[in-house]
Design a protein with these regions (language model features):
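Conserved ASCE/P-loop NTPase catalytic core
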Residues: 34-640
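N-terminal accessory segments that target, anchor, or regulate ATP-driven/P-loop NTPase machines
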Residues: 1-52, 113
Length: 640
């Protein structure tokens, strides 16, 4: 299919269809979605969730406490927002059931750059997917059911067409009232159209932004008299009115109010009756205008607190359904957000060295977390991401303990994703000769930006501490492993050999038995075994070798039982993995001839160096980054 025919087909599928009122009522009998409310249609567009049994995934089970969570494919691009999205869907579900939420404003409250606007845009896109029915010509897209009275007509409509009475709760607009008089009460003359909500054409979807106190009035919401028509109609005539307000255009759909509490309070008054009574007054002496849609608003915390603290606004506050949209607090999800942003830019194919996005995500997440008591914030960040720190940080608490201590406002402060993406833009363009990003440039750019942003002294020191105390030292360790891994061709096999030998020697040492090497026949007594074990333990600074050896041997014996008698991999036990890596890489001098970019003494050294660079490139670095990061690592190690 060509792009032209594809476009034409898509355009044709959204064009309005016309029915008689009788045909519409017959359709109601067959299909309940014909008279569905805006909330019901949004639920249809969102679709059914995927139920995730977190108990089956060790990481998710720690994050969500083994609960079954709902994930909606419609929101798959919104990472780390399960709780927030679940609350939004709950609001629509309750509103669709005709509960109190139907009369409330859905209000997204969160910090700048936290995703409120993106959520609002997504909801507007979703509501465009499901059509609704309106009386042809109605300037406020009102439902044909608005012609009927629940008390007078409800029983007949329910019996003949299966329409529940709760759907007959809207009034007629002044425009319909005038047409009805013209038709002499013959409602069969009304035609019904099937419409698709449209952001572009403002059909069932509208957006309002705050204006200046002096130049914005309620006409932005309710419309105003069209002065061009005053030659033909009196001022209070329904046909002289311009139904251009956001409430008019969003009837049977969704109205978004951006930064709602920045608007003058007088502008917000029509929202009170629109939510509670399903109608609002015009600016002229017309009858009330119906509204049967969703009101969606969002703003930052500072405006909300100012508004809430004013006692005059209590009636309004009672009509608000708050959904908090905090910053993402999981590093892995923050990385997915950066990946999404990069994918939608020209940097999608630019080189990004390993650990760059992770380091930036760790920094931004650390800035959003509240400092825990009796535990370090870096461990808290790792626990929030679902890591198990039982073997590496005994002081680390459970995710629930951290959350309880932090309170409900965690994630409402800190650095935004916008800030992070601007940092990323600078890092990718840092080198004038290569569009690429790496953690060394990231550390430099972050430090410069922290100085330039003019944060409060306490915040500035806190952010610099994150860089110097947590991120830089861990990156030195990370890039060291990357370099050393590329240096050692048989890295995995070598590590497994050390692991197997350590477990074997430790087992014999614990049992106080001599060990005879089956290949050489050499006998190692308990003293000799201890010396061999210490060669592995000392570089890692193991303070209590006896307990450590017992712990490792017990772990391996349990693992063998589930692995057909074979040893587990050397990576399977965090504590011993760290010990083995430190043993393997304790001698940096061995690396120097291979990883340095100086002239080589021999062809053999040059070949080893070339092989090292090739393996680093295979791991995701550019040639230029290999040189930069290797030289940076050697400088840092030398200074230490």
């Amino acid at each position: 299919m060509s792009i032209f025919s594809h476009f034409q087909q898509r355009f044709a599928s959204t064009q309005q269809e016309e029915l008689t009122l009788q045909e519409y009522l017959e359709l109601c009998k067959q299909d309940r979605s014909t008279y569905a409310s805006a909330a019901e249609r949004l639920l249809l567009a969102i679709g059914e969730p995927e139920l995730v049994e977190t108990a089956n995934n060790s990481r998710l089970s720690r994050i969500f406490s083994n609960k079954v969570i709902r994930r909606y494919p419609a929101f798959e691009d919104f990472h780390g927002m399960e709780e927030c999205i679940d609350q939004i869907v709950s609001y629509f579900r309750h509103a669709a059931q005709g509960l109190e939420e139907k009369k409330q404003i859905l209000y997204l409250l969160g910090p700048v750059g936290g995703g409120k606007s993106s959520l609002a845009e997504k909801l507007k896109q979703l509501i465009e997917k499901v059509p609704f029915y309106a009386i042809k010509g109605s300037p406020v897209f009102e439902s044909p059911l608005g012609l009927f009275n629940a008390t007078e007509d409800g029983a007949i409509l329910e019996e003949d067409f299966g329409i529940p009475r709760r759907y007959l709760n809207t009034i007629m607009s002044p425009w319909i009232t005038k047409r009805l008089a013209e038709f002499g009460g013959d409602i069969s003359q009304f035609r019904v159209v099937k419409l698709y909500p449209s952001i572009l054409n403002q059909i069932g979807v509208a957006k309002t932004e705050p204006g200046d106190e002096n130049n914005q009035d309620i006409s932005a919401l309710v419309g105003k008299v069209d002065i061009r028509k005053l030659e033909e109609f009196p001022q209070n005539d329904a046909d002289a009115y311009s139904y251009s307000g956001a409430l008019c255009r969003a009837n049977q759909g969704l109205m978004e109010f951006v930064e709602m509490f920045k608007a003058p309070i007088k502008v917000l008054h029509p929202l009170l009756t629109a939510t509670q009574e399903g109608n609002y007054n015009s600016t002229e002496g017309l009858g009330a205008i119906p509204f049967n849609g969703i009101l969606l608003a969002h703003s930052n915390e500072s405006e909300w607190h100012t508004f809430r603290n004013n006692k005059n606004n209590e009636a309004f506050i009672d009509r608000i359904y708050i959904v908090k949209v905090p910053y993402c607090l999981r590093v892995s999800d923050e990385i997915k957000i950066y990946d999404k942003l990069l994918f939608n830019s020209s940097l999608a194919k630019a080189h990004c060295a390993p650990d760059t996005l992770k380091m930036l995500a760790q920094f931004t997440v650390l800035s959003r977390l509240k400092e825990p008591e009796n535990s370090n914030i870096y461990s808290k960040m790792r626990v929030y991401d679902g890591e198990n720190l039982k073997d590496t940080d005994p002081k680390a608490k459970s995710i629930q303990e951290y959350r309880d201590t932090a309170g409900v406002d965690e994630g409402m402060n800190g650095l935004s994703t916008r800030f992070a993406f601007k940092i990323l833009s600078k890092v990718f363009n840092f080198d004038p000769h290569e569009i690429a990003a790496n953690p060394v440039h990231l550390l430099y750019v972050l430090e410069q930006q922290i100085e330039q942003e003019q944060f409060q002294a306490e915040t500035r020191e806190r952010y610099l501490r994150f860089l110097k105390e947590y991120l830089a030292p861990r990156y030195i360790e990370f890039i060291g492993k990357e370099i050393q891994t590329a240096y050692l061709e048989s890295y995995s096999e070598y590590g497994q050999n050390i692991f197997d030998r350590y477990v074997l020697y430790a087992d014999f040492w614990i049992q106080d038995q001599e060990y005879r090497d089956p290949e050489t026949g050499e006998i190692l007594n308990r003293v000799a075994l201890n010396e061999e074990l210490e060669k592995i333990e000392k570089p890692a600074g193991i303070s209590n070798p006896k307990d450590f050896r017992n712990e490792i041997v017990n772990f391996v014996l349990r693992a063998r039982a589930n692995n057909n008698g074979k040893n587990p991999t050397w990576l399977s036990y965090e504590k011993l993995r760290v010990v083995i890596e430190k043993k393997m890489f304790s001698n940096t001098e061995d690396l120097l001839p291979v990883i340095s970019f100086n002239a080589k003494a021999s062809k053999e050294d040059q070949q080893k160096h070339n092989d090292f660079v090739t393996r680093m490139v295979e791991r995701g670095y550019t040639d230029k980054q290999v040189r930069l990061l290797s030289e940076w690592y050697l400088r840092v190690r030398k200074s230490q």
